[in-house]
Every structure is written in structure tokens, then in C-alpha cells.
Amino acid sequence: MQRIMLRAKLHRVTVTQADLNYEGSCGIDQDLLDAADMKEFEKIELYNVNNGERFSTYIIKGERGSGEISLNGAAARRAHLGDQLIICTYAPMTDEEIATYKPKVILVNEKNGIKEIKKV
């Protein structure tokens, strides 16, 4: 049996851009993607801390070092500039994998720069 488990989380990143007319997706600073081992076009779940919205989309690469968290297309309706989001990826795992696995949690500063990388 497999269970769907948290793989990585960007905790309380701040929305820096929103473009309703873009085709869709969430742009994320490449530094954050590398730290969390998230990949372009990977499905993500987003949780808006400010309004409680929960939605999913996919990743596109943002400029390295920019602090970018951009919501595009329909996702742009789910948050305002300055809102804080929790962005998660999940993966199927067996009980044997779960026994030794620890997800990555990336904590950021007010400019979406990496403050701490934890395995929880």
C-alpha cells in the first residue's frame, strides 16, 4: 500500500506578482525550487494563510534570487499581492519509505529569501 505524504513545503512565502491574463501556473524563485527539490511543471498545492483559499496549479521557474512568487491565470484570483502562502508537494510512499523519510520545509524571510531549511 502507498500513502500520499508531504514531500516538501515552502512555508509562508509572500505573493509578489499576479497576472490574470497569463496562461496559468505559479512562478517560484529558482533558489527556493532548488532548496525544496521542486521541479518545473510539478503539481503543487497552495494554501493562502490570509483568506483560507486552497488551490492547486503547477510550477514554472522564476528568476534566481528574485524572491518571486507569482500567481498566474485563474490562480491569480486566489490571492492578493502580499498574501502569505504555504506551497506543498506530495509523493506516494510505501510504509517502508515513510519509516525513514523526512520532508523538507523551507522557511523564508520577508523577501522570500531562504532563512532556514529543515527536515521534519
UniProtKB/Swiss-Prot annotation:
Active site per database record: 25, 58
GO molecular function, one term: aspartate 1-decarboxylase activity
Name of the protein this chain belongs to: Aspartate 1-decarboxylase
Binding-site residues, substrate: 57, 73-75
Modification type Pyruvic acid (Ser): residues: 25
Listed CDD domains: Asp_decarbox (cd06919)
Stated family: Belongs to the PanD family.
Function: Catalyzes the pyruvoyl-dependent decarboxylation of aspartate to produce beta-alanine.
Leader sequence segment: none
Cofactor(s) for this UniProt protein: pyruvate
SUPFAM superfamilies listed in its UniProt record: ADC-like
Reactions that this protein is recorded to catalyse: L-aspartate + H(+) = beta-alanine + CO2
EC annotation from Swiss-Prot or TrEMBL: 4.1.1.11
Biochemical pathway: Cofactor biosynthesis; (R)-pantothenate biosynthesis; beta-alanine from L-aspartate: step 1/1
Keywords tagged on the record: Autocatalytic cleavage, Cytoplasm, Decarboxylase, Lyase, Pantothenate biosynthesis, Pyruvate, Schiff base, Zymogen
GO biological process, one term: pantothenate biosynthetic process
Species per Swiss-Prot/TrEMBL record: Cupriavidus taiwanensis (strain DSM 17343 / BCRC 17206 / CCUG 44338 / CIP 107171 / LMG 19424 / R1)
Record localization: Cytoplasm
